[in-house]
From Swiss-Prot:
This is HTH-type transcriptional regulator AlkS. SUPFAM superfamilies: C-terminal effector domain of the bipartite response regulators. The lineage of its organism: Bacteria, Pseudomonadati, Pseudomonadota, Gammaproteobacteria, Pseudomonadales. Pathway: Hydrocarbon metabolism; alkane degradation. GO terms for biological process: alkane catabolic process; regulation of DNA-templated transcription. GO terms for molecular function: DNA binding.
Length: 883
């Protein structure tokens, strides 16, 4: 949706309306028009209510509606009810005055003894008697509806809305729902709440453009919108000042806004309630009453949620409420400033409340804030399952259990198992295995934790986190056969681990099968944490295949999937951020702030499994190289290599070293003998041999081309392409095709080079690994100067689609898309050119092949799609989502 700025030069029908037009126009100055908030025409409800806390643009939306109505020549009334002294008489008189200006009603020639209506119900009756008001659609805007008006006046307004002619419509802005129940019941009201009024990323970008804010990228804006949950006024403040690195609530403008517009506007008792509520993760009447030893929580919650919308319902939990996170930070600052001595005491009461109710996730988080870790020694099996396996509280448990004395830790095997699980996911496998050493014994039916095989399961999955995939797969399958029937939670975890292993090893057919099993078991066992890891496995498949738009789609699904609860814990949300880095880089939308990089690098240093660790480091290295920071590019890879050596992760070490060798080519160093010796390493004969060999062959090809050994370089590139195709690694295949083209151009076989460049570009366009193409072509042109001419002949922007995200076609992986599984990349490319109206001869020229080859491809396409003509082929391919 394109956002546009409304012109404020509006025609005015009557001179008496100049004042109102000026007033309303001022309200939209430097604001953006959001069409999605407009009042729908036709059969839509007659009343549109904009209801949200301060700063959500309610009045702005209302003003735009008034102006939109006036620009079409239709009458519009504007009433602001901010003054607490407003009476029904005042409102009635103001409406009449404005309607008379439009000659919709007239009371100047009524018979003697009859006065103008002073009550809204009488005005409604008068409007029915007016011919003009029944014919012309009129909009009445009521701004600042609030609980201070009192129920009698609110009810009178609602009755007026219901009893006026249908040609009169209403737009209302305020922060209360009081008095609107009849309108809701009658189906006469369309409501835009806080969620609707929040800025989308596109709208925030439009605001930046409207106010000519410089130095803020779209990715930064998107992150800001996500962090602010779209609160327009906060986003506006932050865009006008330097974006803070720490707490946003400490920004002076935001602090002042919260204090003046929200905090000081509340009665004292509700200010106290809000400050206290900021200490709780979720606010419930019983929980608040227990923690703060009072009895009035229910009435305060009702008042603040109904009249100010400052407390929001937790989705799916109507009895639970939360505060906006930035407002909560502001209120917590007040709480600790006013009463720092009570901090620990109140937090412990809150933690105990959740603990007593079995809400251990909340209890642990609050207990950590209170620096109280004593409860860990009393954890039962149920709690360990909930926290470790179902909830995935890795970060929280690591901090908590690390504080326990060793003697207390060893008193409870369940706590020990839990800690080992956490350590494995924190890349501390040696320490984890030391804890499990005495627990991995033959099952003892007297010990429930042994009977269900918890130590063996943690050990099996832990091996995968340490990149020992073969052993982990063997142990997981063995565990499922021994314990799977009696331990659903454990079985779900083991199947999820297998899914991750298969994704890492490019075993995509096996991955599809185990994903179906894992999803079914995890759903039955309520395994929220495992669902997050299943998304990670799918993401690994998408990234390994090079399908970046599919990866992007999966990330969006993961973040919005309430069943997976990925955003509920820091561990899984940061894992998603780390995986997102590669897709954002390829789609040319990377957040390049060092702060963002630092956060992700810190996370992978503590929790990064090999595939995630390498993905992040490779992207950061490539980005730095693109900025001509060769030393910085190598530095991050050297860090990854040193980390791998420290943690005994040979695959990570080898992949990092291969990338380092590629960077060293810029300095004229080839290490060709060392590269050949790499193939003798044990890791090259394991399950990851194909992608490792492909990466090594690519660097060898580049090194040979640099030494002008073009024949052997082309041979190495072909071998890399074969390895990539064997495992469906599209991104590696694109690189191989470009390296092959570079070697062919260097050797003088230009036509073959052109053919492979065209093929690589078409493949990259479909996969949407755009940055790979840009990076590799820049590298090839620098190392093989004779290839510059053939690459210069390619219009990259046109070939790849100008890298414009809105123009990108999503590559969706759906059950219906059967043909996409059988049509080759070349055949899909042929179909796209057919759709553009190209003849077989034109297609052959563009793809650097013979016309007979195109005819052969068309026959295959007809067979696979079961069609008889080119037109039918296009229709069927579009229906199945192939093109």
């Amino acid at each position: 949706m394109k956002i546009k700025i409304i012109n404020n030069d509006f025609p005015v029908a009557k001179i008496g309306l100049d004042r109102i037009t000026t007033l309303v126009s001022a309200k939209v100055h430097n604001c953006i028009y959001r069409p999605r908030l407009s009042i729908a025409d036709g059969t839509a409800p007659r009343v549109c209510l904009y209801r949200a806390p301060p700063g959500y643009g309610k009045t702005v939306a209302l003003a735009f509606e008034w102006l939109r109505h006036r620009t079409t020549g239709r009458p519009a009334v504007w009433i602001s009810l901010r003054a607490s002294s407003y009476s029904e008489f005042d409102i009635c008189a103001e409406i009449i005055e404005q309607l008379e200006a439009f000659e919709l009603v007239t009371f100047s020639h009524v018979r003697e003894g009859v006065s103008k209506p002073t009550l809204l119900r009488d005005l409604a009756s008068s409007l029915w008697q007016s011919t003009s008001s029944n014919e012309i659609e009129t909009l009445i805007c009521l701004d600042n509806i609030n609980q201070g008006l009192g129920l009698p006046l609110l009810h009178a307004l609602m009755e007026f809305m219901l009893e006026t002619p249908k040609s009169i419509r209403f737009a209302v802005a305020g922060n209360t729902i009081k008095g609107f129940s009849r309108l809701k019941l009658a189906g006469a009201m369309q409501e835009h709440t806080e969620k609707d009024l929040a800025f989308s990323a596109d709208e925030a970008v439009a605001l930046v453009e409207a106010e000519a804010v410089l130095g803020v990228s779209e990715v930064q804006i998107e992150a800001l919108v996500q962090e602010m949950e779209g609160w327009p006024v906060l986003i506006g403040f932050l865009l006008k000042c330097e974006l803070p690195a720490k707490s946003i609530s400490t920004v002076v403008e935001i602090d002042n806004y919260f204090n003046d517009e929200i905090f000081e506007a509340l009665p004292e008792r509700y200010r106290v309630f809000l400050v206290n509520s900021s200490l709780l993760d979720v606010v419930t009447p019983d929980g608040y009453n227990y923690v703060f030893k009072c009895v009035n929580a229910a009435s305060c919650i009702k008042y603040l949620s109904t009249n100010y919308m400052l407390l929001r319902h937790v989705e799916g939990e109507p009895a639970q409420f939360t505060l906006h996170p930035v407002l909560r930070d502001f209120l917590q600052g007040i709480a600790w400033a006013e009463n720092p001595a009570k901090r620990s005491y109140l937090l412990k009461r809150a933690a105990f409340w959740h603990w007593r109710r079995g809400e251990y996730q909340y209890a642990i988080r609050i207990a950590l804030r209170a620096n109280d870790c004593r409860w860990a020694v009393g954890m039962s099996e149920g709690i360990i399952l909930d926290l470790s396996f179902r909830q995935g509280e890795i970060d929280t448990l690591r901090h908590w259990l690390s504080e326990l004395p060793v003697k207390d830790l060893h008193k409870n095997p369940i706590v020990l198992i839990c800690f080992a699980w956490v350590l494995y996911f924190s890349q501390q496998s040696a320490r984890a295995e030391k804890l499990l050493k005495d627990l991995i014994t033959p099952p003892d039916k007297k010990n429930k934790w042994q009977e269900k095989g918890w130590p063996q399961l943690v050990f099996a999955i832990g091996k995968a986190t340490n990149d020992e995939m073969l052993l982990s797969e063997e142990l997981c399958n063995k565990w499922i056969s021994l314990f799977g029937d009696s331990n659903a939670v454990g079985k779900g975890a083991a199947l999820t681990c297998l899914a991750f292993i298969f994704a890492s090893e490019y075993r995509f057919a096996e991955l599809e099968k185990v994903l179906a099993q894992a999803q079914a078991v995890n759903k039955f066992a309520k395994q929220d944490f495992a669902f997050g890891w299943l998304y990670v496995a799918k993401l690994q498949q998408a990234l390994a295949s090079g399908k970046m738009s599919w990866a992007r789609q999966l990330i969006t699904q993961a973040r919005t999937d309430s069943g997976a609860q990925i955003m509920e814990t820091a561990f899984t949300s940061k894992m998603l951020d780390a995986l997102e880095l590669e897709s954002n880089y390829e789609l040319c939308r990377l957040d390049t702030s060092e702060e963002k990089f630092s956060e992700i690098l810190e996370f992978i240093a503590n929790h990064g499994v090999t595939d995630v660790f390498f993905s992040v480091c490779r992207v950061v290295s490539a980005w730095r190289l693109g900025r001509n920071d060769l030393n910085g590019s190598i530095e991050i890879l050297e860090w990854a290599k040193a980390y791998a050596a420290e943690k005994n992760l040979p695959r990570l070490e080898v992949m990092s070293q291969i990338e380092i060798y590629q960077r060293l080519l810029f300095q004229g160093v080839t290490y060709i003998n060392t590269l050949q010796a790499f193939e003798d390493r044990k890791i090259f004969s394991g399950p990851h041999s194909a992608p490792l060999k492909a990466r090594l062959l690519l660097v060898q090809s580049l090194a040979l081309s640099r030494d002008q050994n073009f024949h052997l370089a082309a041979h190495r590139a072909l071998l890399a392409i074969q390895q990539a195709r064997k495992i469906s690694a599209g991104q590696l295949e694109v690189r191989g095709l470009l390296y092959l083209a570079g070697a062919q151009a260097g050797g003088g076989t230009l036509k073959k080079a052109q053919h492979n460049i065209a093929y690589a570009l078409e493949m990259a366009k479909q996969l949407q690994c755009f940055q790979t193409v840009l990076d590799e072509i820049r590298l090839i042109k620098r190392l093989i100067p004779t290839s510059c001419e053939v690459f210069a002949a390619v219009n990259l922007d046109q070939a790849i689609g100008a890298f414009s995200l809105p123009q990108m076609v999503e590559i969706r992986k759906s059950a219906e898309n059967k043909a996409g599984d059988f049509l080759t990349l070349k055949q899909v490319s042929v179909l796209k050119l057919v759709k553009e109206g190209c003849s077989n001869k034109q297609i052959a020229t563009k793809m650097y092949v013979t016309e007979d080859a195109i005819k052969w491809h068309m026959r295959k396409i007809f067979t696979i799609l079961n069609v008889k003509s080119r037109t039918q082929a296009i229709i069927e391919a579009e229906r199945q989502g192939v093109i």
